[in-house]
Amino acid sequence: MSEYTYTVDVIGDDALTDSVIMKTVTEVIDQHINTISEYAFYGCAALQTVIGTNVTSIRSDCFTGCTSLETVSFPVLKVMDGYFRNCTALKNVDLPQLKDIRKQYAFEKCTALERIDLPLCTHIGVGTNYSCYAFHYCSSLTTVILRSETMCSLDDISVFSDTPISKGTGYIYVPQALIESYQAHEKWSVYANQFRAIEDYPEICGQ
């Protein structure tokens, strides 16, 4: 396995695009990087694992087209400004502090992604005047967990289009106290039949 060690605070725009490293690096694990800029790992087809302990900012298309990427972990990231679009092998997503997904195609076509747990997320969308396809064509996505006791706002109903959730075979797990609020919400109501209470499914939701 190839490993590349960074000693800088920011990975800049197009950092590895078209580079020799792009074709060979499989793992990036770093405790110092805080920003991953636009297109930094764009099309890094060999990349399998990214763990950024102190990353607080990821930018547009920074991981788009990383077709071997299976695991990402950003423990302190709060705002999703980057893309994992077309990361077709992505299965393990660890974003425990994420509060806001505000990129139009954040996880679009992550076809291997079956489950995503967003404990603190309170907003998904790019504004009410724009379509949002954050999980569009995530064809394996059957489990979305929104644990926050504050209802997660949704700007556009297209966020789960062409997923098992939109087709009636996937589910969104939220606190029992918020079930009716989600089902009555102007946008979330499209998925009204797919809501389940976290408390009723410990085998799926844990905690």
Label each PLM-derived region with a short phrase.
Residues 156-163, 180-193:
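Short, aromatic/basic amphipathic alpha-helical patches
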Residues 198-207:
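Low-complexity, Pro/Thr/Ser/Gly/Ala-rich linker/spacer regions in secreted
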